[in-house]
């Protein structure tokens, strides 16, 4: 994963099939950014302004008992003021039992509707860090300047898909957050293009990019956020292959990517985006939101890879547009 900047000083409206979308410009979205206020020296001794290869990446942080805001998930900026992430990031308990005591076939994904954070908890305990490369200063991993830690903003409102209403089993693992202010003045931040603005098609077998600060067992971060953003290229899979690998039906809004023993999204990467690079425009489009898959520690230990199941953003166009236009 990596970084780049763009400063936006205006609000833009875009017409989508007769609907205006606030805070979005399809000419400026999806472009990488550069930090202009400081310089870094790379491993080869070259000094320059660092670029942010995923300036739409954000950290979802929740206030812990000690008062610190811990990174629990990733997310993706989709306008100057809005973020997409996963609904299960706000789940209090995992592995609930169905009536009768049997766990479901989706790795304990079953839940009750009252197992998520309350609306008040989401608004008062959750913040979003934008324009960041790092979760904290740590020179060993190239996190040496405070500006690499981005800017943290509060959430003014949000909307959750029907994830909890269907016991966390039938898709809709999506949340859209509205930030208290725009990212106009945030160095290193930009938003990804939406896949229906303009419409983009992905060919079967194409690669997508994942980004986040999730755990990395291979580097000793088994249950902790990695200091520096990491970026991975993942191969897409057909829904048929995905269902075969899981041995059961998958959510209606699934978008699947291949798992590998040494290359996969891990705990803490949930809610982050999968983007598709459009070569002719050199821009990144968010296609999906990381939802669930195999445990990285188990994969490293030799477990058979299955498929990573993500939430297809294109299946939630109306949900996204309606929320943004209520701003």
UniProtKB/Swiss-Prot annotation:
InterPro entries: CLIP_Serine_Protease (IPR051333), Peptidase_S1_PA (IPR009003), Peptidase_S1_PA_chymotrypsin (IPR043504), Peptidase_S1A (IPR001314), Trypsin_dom (IPR001254), TRYPSIN_HIS (IPR018114)
Ribonucleoprotein keyword on record: no
Signal peptide start-end: 1-21
Active-site residues, as the UniProt record annotates them: 88, 173, 270
Keywords linked to the UniProt accession: Cytoplasmic vesicle, Differentiation, Disulfide bond, Glycoprotein, Hydrolase, Protease, Secreted, Serine protease, Signal, Spermatogenesis
Subcellular location: Secreted; Cytoplasmic vesicle, Secretory vesicle lumen
GO cellular component: extracellular space; secretory vesicle
Gene Ontology molecular-function annotations: serine-type endopeptidase activity
Domain Peptidase S1: 43-327
EC number in record: 3.4.21.-
Glycosylation (residues): 207
PROSITE patterns for this protein: TRYPSIN_DOM, TRYPSIN_HIS
Regulation of its activity: In the male gonad, probably maintained inactive by swm-1.
Source domain of life: Eukaryota
Main location: secreted
Tissue specificity remark: Specifically expressed in the male gonad including the seminal vesicle, the valve region and the vas deferens.
Cystine pairings recorded for this chain: 73-89, 242-256, 266-296
GO biological process, one term: proteolysis
Task performed by this protein: Serine protease which, in males, acts as a promoting signal during mating to activate sperm.
Family: Belongs to the peptidase S1 family.
PANTHER family with a match to the protein in the record: PTHR24260, TRYPSIN-LIKE PROTEASE TRY-5 (PTHR24260:SF141)
Name this protein carries in UniProt: Trypsin-like protease try-5
Source species of the chain: Caenorhabditis elegans
Lineage, highest ranks first: Eukaryota, Metazoa, Ecdysozoa, Nematoda, Chromadorea
Gene that specifies this protein: try-5
């Amino acid at each position: 994963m990596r970084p780049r900047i763009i400063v936006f000083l205006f609000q833009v409206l875009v017409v989508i099939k007769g609907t205006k979308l606030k805070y979005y410009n399809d000419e400026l979205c999806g472009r990488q950014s550069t930090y202009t206020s400081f310089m870094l020296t790379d491993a080869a001794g070259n000094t320059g302004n660092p670029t942010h290869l995923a300036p739409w990446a954000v950290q979802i942080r929740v206030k812990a008992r000690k008062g610190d805001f811990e990174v629990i998930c990733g997310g993706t900026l989709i306008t100057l003021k809005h973020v997409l992430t996963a609904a299960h990031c706000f789940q209090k308990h995992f592995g609930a039992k169905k009536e009768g005591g049997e766990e479901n076939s989706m790795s304990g994904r079953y839940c009750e509707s009252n197992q998520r954070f309350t609306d008040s908890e989401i608004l008062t305990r959750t913040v979003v860090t934008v324009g960041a490369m790092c979760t904290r200063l740590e020179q060993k991993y190239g996190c040496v300047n405070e500006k690499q830690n981005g800017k943290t903003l509060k959430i003014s409102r949000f909307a959750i898909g029907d994830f909890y209403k269907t016991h966390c089993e039938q898709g809709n693992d999506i949340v859209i957050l509205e930030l208290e202010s725009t990212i106009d003045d945030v160095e290193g931040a930009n938003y990804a293009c939406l896949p229906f603005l303009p419409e983009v098609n992905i060919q079967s077998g194409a690669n997508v990019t994942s980004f986040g600060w999730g755990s990395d067992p291979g580097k000793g971060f088994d249950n902790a956020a990695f200091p520096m953003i990491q970026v991975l290229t993942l191969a897409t899979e057909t829904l048929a292959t995905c269902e075969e690998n899981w041995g059961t039906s998958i959510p209606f809004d699934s978008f699947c990517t291949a798992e590998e023993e040494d290359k996969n999204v891990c705990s803490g990467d949930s809610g982050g985006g999968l983007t598709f690079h459009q070569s002719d425009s050199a821009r990144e489009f968010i296609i999906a939101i990381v939802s669930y898959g195999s445990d990285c520690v188990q994969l490293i230990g030799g477990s058979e890879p299955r498929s990573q199941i993500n939430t297809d953003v294109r299946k939630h166009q109306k949900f996204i547009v309606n929320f943004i236009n209520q701003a």
